[in-house]
Curated annotation (Swiss-Prot):
The keyword DNA repair does not apply. GO terms for cellular component: plasma membrane. GO terms for molecular function: manganese ion transmembrane transporter activity. The chain crosses the membrane at residues 3-23, 35-55, 56-76, 107-127, 129-149, 166-186. This is Putative manganese efflux pump MntP. It is a multi-pass membrane protein. It comes from Campylobacter jejuni subsp. jejuni serotype O:2 (strain ATCC 700819 / NCTC 11168). Probably functions as a manganese efflux pump. It is found in: Cell inner membrane. It comes from the Bacteria. It holds the Pfam family Mntp. Belongs to the MntP (TC 9.B.29) family. Keywords: Cell inner membrane, Cell membrane, Ion transport, Manganese, Membrane, Transmembrane, Transmembrane helix, Transport.
Length: 187
């Protein structure tokens, strides 16, 4: 996977965390540095950790499914993308009690928003991906997106939440199709 695809993938994976961070920002009257750090570290950290775990799960089974790896990557990315698009079309509002930045709440949210990254990590095992670069980009881009989302959410509310998830879903599907086409026609 080339550098620009990793950038797009990182942005797409960060959209769930971006949407949650918008809600967090919406629920806080006054943001402090600790809010930015908590949201950025939890979401960015888990977005980087989960593909790493997924990658090691994937390489465990790589020899068994090497002949269909491109299909697996395509299916995983497409399903995750479709799930994100579906969620973006559901008219969910931000939780008015989303102003919780405690350990349990943030841990649960970080895990929930990074499950997609775990599945993407599995697909990394079948692709030509620089894992260290990928997890660095995923983590740092998610960190930055969440900090921006916290501020935007604090200023503008929930208007952008569903659009972020929709965009993320579309990007994942496009990447899945790109991987499939490259493998079927250009390998």
């Amino acid at each position: 996977m080339d550098f620009y695809s990793l950038i797009f993938l990182s942005c797409a994976l960060g959209m769930d965390a971006f949407a949650v961070s918008l809600c967090k920002g919406f629920s806080v009257k006054k943001l402090h540095l600790k809010h930015y750090l908590i949201v950025g570290i939890y979401f960015g950290g888990f977005q980087a950790l989960m593909p790493t775990i997924g990658y090691f799960i994937g390489i465990t089974f790589a020899s068994f499914i090497a002949s269909i790896d491109h299909w697996i990557a395509f299916i995983l990315l497409s399903l995750i993308g479709l799930k994100m698009i579906k969620e973006s079309l559901e008219n969910e509002n931000c939780d008015s009690n989303a102003n919780q930045f405690g350990f349990k709440t943030m841990l649960a949210l970080a895990i929930a928003t990074s499950i997609d990254a775990l599945a993407v990590g599995v697909s990394f095992a079948f692709l030509n991906v620089n894992l260290l670069l990928a997890i660095f980009l995923i983590g740092i881009i998610t960190f930055i997106l969440c900090i921006i989302a916290l501020k935007i959410g604090n200023k503008f509310g929930i208007y952008l939440k569903n659009k972020a998830e929709l965009l993320g879903g579309l990007v994942l599907i496009i990447l899945g199709v790109k991987i499939l086409i490259e493998h079927l026609f250009f390998d």
